[in-house]
C-alpha cells in the first residue's frame, strides 16, 4: 500500500451496565429467558411514555469527561424513524442533533508511537432487539431499550493496528469508569468500521465501505487489512469501489457484502416530544467523579517501579488491577513479582483469572509478611499460595499443618552444619583451596537432608562462621 493511505473512522456501540433500561423500568438481565425482561414501553404499546434513566446520563457524562469532550448542558433526544421488527414502536430514541458529548480525543499507543485520535461525538440511545436467523427469524426483546453510548471517531485512523489500539483504549476506559462490561464476545462492545482508500497526498476521500458489528480485536485487524487490500486491488485494476455495507466472515477471513447503498437513508430525525429538554447544571456535572483512568494507572505503576510487562497486564485487565491494588503491601515492585509469579501463574494453570481463585487479599498480605520475616522461605511461599484458594482459616496454623515453617534458629542450624562437616571431613579440608565447592556442597546437603526448610541465608552465615574458625 505504498501509494495509498487508508482513511478509517470507527463507530463503537457500548452497552451500559445500568440496572434498568434506557427509557423503561425493565430490569436488564442478559441471562434471562427470552422476552421476559420487557414491558409495554419496550414493546411500543400506544399511550406509553419513556422515562429517562439518570444512571445512563451519568455514565455519558463520565465518558465525555474521560474523552476530553465538551458536554452539552441541555439534554435533547430525537427519533430515528425506520420500520424494522427489532424496534416495534417504529423508531429509535437517540441523540442526533445535540449529543451529550462532542469534540473530544483520546491518545493511543502503537509500535509507531503515540497518536491522538479525535472523536466527533458520543450520544445516548437505546439498543434494539436481538435477532436470531434460522429457518425462522426469532426476536428477543430483552435487549430492546438497553442503554447504549455510541462513540463516533473522526476519520483519522490510518491502520488496522491503530484501530485495534483505539477500540481497546475505549474498552479500558469503559471498564475503568465501571460503565460497561465492555465484553466484545458478548456484544456489549461492538464496532462498525468505515474504510476508504486514497492516493497519498490527496485530500479528497475515496468511496467508503462500512463493516458492521465486529466483535473481536482479531476480527477488527483482519477485516481492515483484508478490505484495504481489496480496495487497493480494485483501484489498480480500475474496478469501481461501491458504497457498501459489509460484514466480516471469520471462516473465510473476508468481508462479505450485505447491501449496496444507492443513496443516503433519510431517517427523518425529529425531536422526541415525549422527553422534555433537561438542563444539566454545572453542579450536577461537577459532582460526577471519575475513577482512575488507564493512563493515570499506568503512570502510578511506573512510579511504583513495577516492570513494564506487569503494567501492561494490569492496565489491560481492570479487574486484575483492582485485585492487585487491594493488596496492602508497601513495596509494590516486590508485590508485583510475587503476584505474577505465583498467583497469576496459578490462575493461568487453572484457566481462570487471578481474582476468580478466591484468594483473600488479607491471606496474601499475611503470607508475604511471613516471607519478609523469614518465617517461611520462598520455596514454602510457592507451596502455600495454592493452599489459599477458597481458604478460610488461620495462616499460621496452615503453615504448621503442612510443615512449611522455615528453620532459622542458629543453634539448630549450627548442629546440622557440624553433622555434615563431620561426615565429610576429607572434602571440608579442601576449604582453603576450594572454598566455593565446599560451601556449595555443605549447603546443598543441608537443604537436601532437611527438605529445603532451612533458611539458606542463615545457613550460609553459620557455615562461613564455622569454616573460618576451623581454618583460620
Swiss-Prot record:
Sorted UniProt keywords: ATP-binding, Ligase, Nucleotide-binding, Protein biosynthesis
Catalytic activities: L-glutamyl-tRNA(Gln) + L-glutamine + ATP + H2O = L-glutaminyl-tRNA(Gln) + L-glutamate + ADP + phosphate + H(+); L-aspartyl-tRNA(Asn) + L-glutamine + ATP + H2O = L-asparaginyl-tRNA(Asn) + L-glutamate + ADP + phosphate + 2 H(+)
Enzyme Commission number, as recorded: 6.3.5.-
Enzyme class: ligase
InterPro entries assigned: Asn/Gln-tRNA_amidoTrfase_suB/E, Asn/Gln-tRNA_Trfase_suB/E_cat, Asn/Gln_amidotransferase, Asn/Gln_tRNA_amidoTrase-B-like, GatB, GatB_Yqey_C_2, Gln-tRNA_amidoTrfase_suB_CS, Gln_synth/guanido_kin_cat_dom
Pfam families: GatB_N, GatB_Yqey
One term of GO molecular function: ATP binding
Subunit structure as annotated in this protein's UniProt entry: Heterotrimer of A, B and C subunits.
Role of this protein: Allows the formation of correctly charged Asn-tRNA(Asn) or Gln-tRNA(Gln) through the transamidation of misacylated Asp-tRNA(Asn) or Glu-tRNA(Gln) in organisms which lack either or both of asparaginyl-tRNA or glutaminyl-tRNA synthetases. The reaction takes place in the presence of glutamine and ATP through an activated phospho-Asp-tRNA(Asn) or phospho-Glu-tRNA(Gln).
Name of the featured protein: Aspartyl/glutamyl-tRNA(Asn/Gln) amidotransferase subunit B
Amino acid at each position: 500500500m505504498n501509494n495509498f493511505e487508508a482513511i478509517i473512522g470507527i463507530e463503537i456501540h457500548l452497552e451500559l451496565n445500568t440496572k434498568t433500561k434506557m427509557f423503561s423500568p425493565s430490569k436488564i438481565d442478559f441471562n434471562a429467558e427470552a422476552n421476559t425482561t420487557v414491558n409495554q414501553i419496550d414493546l411500543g404499546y400506544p399511550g406509553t411514555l419513556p422515562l429517562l434513566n439518570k444512571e445512563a446520563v451519568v455514565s455519558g457524562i463520565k465518558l465525555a469527561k474521560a474523552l476530553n469532550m465538551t458536554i452539552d448542558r441541555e439534554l435533547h433526544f430525537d427519533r430515528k424513524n425506520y420500520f424494522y421488527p427489532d424496534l416495534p414502536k417504529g423508531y429509535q430514541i437517540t441523540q442526533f442533533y445535540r449529543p451529550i458529548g462532542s469534540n473530544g480525543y483520546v491518545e493511543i499507543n502503537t509500535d509507531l508511537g503515540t497518536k491522538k485520535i479525535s472523536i466527533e461525538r458520543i450520544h445516548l440511545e437505546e439498543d434494539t432487539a436481538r435477532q436470531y436467523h434460522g429457518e425462522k427469524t426469532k426476536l428477543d426483546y430483552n435487549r430492546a431499550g438497553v442503554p447504549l453510548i455510541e462513540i463516533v471517531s473522526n476519520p483519522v485512523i490510518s491502520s488496522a493496528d491503530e484501530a485495534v489500539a483505539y477500540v481497546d483504549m475505549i474498552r479500558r476506559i469503559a471498564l475503568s469508569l465501571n460503565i460497561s462490561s465492555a465484553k466484545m464476545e458478548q456484544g456489549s462492545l461492538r464496532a462498525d468500521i468505515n474504510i476508504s482508500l486514497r492516493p497519498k497526498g490527496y485530500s479528497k476521500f475515496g468511496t467508503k465501505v462500512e463493516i458492521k458489528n465486529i466483535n473481536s480485536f482479531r476480527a477488527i485487524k483482519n477485516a481492515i487489512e483484508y478490505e484495504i487490500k481489496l480496495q487497493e486491488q480494485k483501484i489498480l485494476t480500475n474496478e469501481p469501489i461501491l458504497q457498501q455495507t459489509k460484514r466480516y466472515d471469520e471462516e473465510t477471513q473476508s468481508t462479505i457484502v450485505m447491501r449496496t447503498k444507492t443513496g443516503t437513508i433519510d431517517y427523518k430525525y425529529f425531536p422526541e416530544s415525549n422527553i422534555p429538554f433537561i438542563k444539566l447544571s454545572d453542579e450536577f456535572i461537577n459532582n460526577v467523579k471519575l475513577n482512575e483512568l488507564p493512563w493515570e494507572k499506568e503512570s502510578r505503576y511506573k512510579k511504583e517501579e513495577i516492570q513494564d510487562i506487569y503494567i501492561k497486564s494490569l492496565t489491560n485487565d481492570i479487574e486484575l488491577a483492582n485485585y492487585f491494588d487491594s493488596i496492602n503491601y508497601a513495596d509494590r515492585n516486590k508485590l508485583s513479582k510475587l503476584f505474577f509469579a505465583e498467583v497469576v501463574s496459578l490462575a493461568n494453570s487453572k484457566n481462570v483469572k487471578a481474582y476468580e481463585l478466591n484468594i483473600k487479599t488479607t491471606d496474601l498480605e499475611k503470607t508475604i509478611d511471613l516471607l519478609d520475616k523469614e518465617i517461611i522461605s520462598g520455596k514454602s511461599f510457592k507451596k502455600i499460595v495454592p493452599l489459599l484458594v477458597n481458604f478460610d482459616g488461620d495462616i499460621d496454623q496452615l503453615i504448621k499443618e503442612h510443615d512449611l515453617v522455615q528453620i532459622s534458629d542458629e543453634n539448630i542450624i549450627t548442629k546440622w552444619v557440624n553433622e555434615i562437616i563431620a561426615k565429610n571431613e576429607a572434602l571440608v579440608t579442601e576449604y582453603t583451596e576450594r572454598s566455593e565447592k565446599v560451601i556449595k556442597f555443605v549447603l546443598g546437603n543441608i537443604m537436601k537432608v532437611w527438605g529445603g526448610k532451612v533458611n539458606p541465608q542463615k545457613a550460609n552465615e553459620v557455615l562461613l562462621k564455622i569454616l573460618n574458625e576451623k581454618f583460620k
